Amino acid sequence: MTFDPLSDMVSDHYEKWVYPDPIFDLPGWMANNWQWFDPRISHRMFWPDRDYVADIDILIAGCGTNQAAVFAYANPQASVVGIDISRSSLDHHDYLKSHYGLTNLELHQLPIEEVHSLNRDFDLIVSSGVLHHLADPLLGLQSLAASLRPDGVIGIMLYAKYGRVGVEMLQAVFRDLGLGQDQPSVEIVREVIAALPADHPVTSYLGIASDLHSDAGLVDTFLHRRDRSFTVDDCLDLVTGAGLVFQDWLLKSPYQHPLTSGSQFQTSMSELSQQQQWSVMERINARNACHFFTTCHENRPTQTYRIDFETDAFIDLIPEFRYRCELVDTQLLRHDWTLPLGGVALALVEQVDGERSISDIISRVSDDPSLAGENQSTLSDTSRNVFRSLWNLDFFAMRISNS
């Protein structure tokens, strides 16, 4: 029997339980919310060697109720194509397209596995929270890879295994109870969550999940008929299995260790491969419930996107504040936390303007009389450590200079 994604149980799910919550006020929503893969705010993580290009071709693969419209609204010169298996989700997209005059938005009821039928290729493909619901995630990613231009980027979000341990425990409970995707089952889910002990493994997830207020959000999280979670190794295996290469984590901080240089833990970690270090840290930073990462074709020149702090050429990198990041007095602010700075680290970050290279910044800081004790060699090593750390903590993106 031929598998038809449009008559699959996942398609039935999203026809009945429209998800995520429909947005009716796009500019109002965007005042305090954003899409991490939006090139308007994240292009530097996709293409570190070039500035934002307004008129790119974007595919939102599994656009849900709002995502393609958000991209089209935020990037008015881009051509945005949204595909989804849910007619209900696309109906709301049609409303947003008409209401906001999104002439740059094209919509299709189409499964990811059949994206080839568009006969199009794209600069940026975004599949956020979708591949982990497919019957065959590898086939889905292979299909997307076939529609990616040679220097294009695919942005992917997948469920992270260890941050969803509590979710998976409750999913198993609700399966044992014989719950379905109906209103009585949703009420039982609410009763169980309300009665959970404070130390239940799902508690940390409940604290960060923003969509559990709605019935559709509860169904999507706890009563989904098909989803799976991925480890770091699973993510990289999926990428290589699709004939692609792993470009980078879009959100890197969950995979970084917090201990200072010289600790025994860091010494032991340094003996591991990069992938092994990420794997260790996902089990330590176990609250992380989603992997956000980028991937690209194998033949894309690595010098156009690989950020390298290991060689002395790191001084040519140009640091830029990432979206919603800034320095206020001595506090480095991110959208979700604050890092106090002082001494040389503060002096270095104060010189970041999105135009100066690390080499330029070192030169300016070396002229600071208050840091007279820092010689050029020490300052270079400190700069490497400071900017590598703040890049890994998602405060900075790095531009690759073409000069």
Feature map (PLM): residue ranges:
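A short glycine-rich, Lys/Arg-flanked "PGG" loop and its adjoining helix->strand segment in the class I
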Residues: L138-D151
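Long, charge-rich, low-complexity alpha-helical segments
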Residues: H257-H291, T295, W337-S403
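Conserved alpha-helix/loop element of class I SAM-dependent methyltransferases that forms part
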Residues: K16-I56, V70
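Conserved SAM/SAH-binding beta-strand->alpha-helix loop
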Residues: S86-S88
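Conserved SAM-binding strand-loop segment of SAM-dependent methyltransferases
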Residues: H99-E114
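Conserved class I S-adenosyl-L-methionine
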Residues: V153-Y205
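A short acidic, Gly/Pro-enriched loop at the edge of an enzyme's catalytic core
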Residues: E113-I125
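Conserved SAM-binding loop of SAM-dependent methyltransferases across substrates and taxa
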Residues: G64-Q77
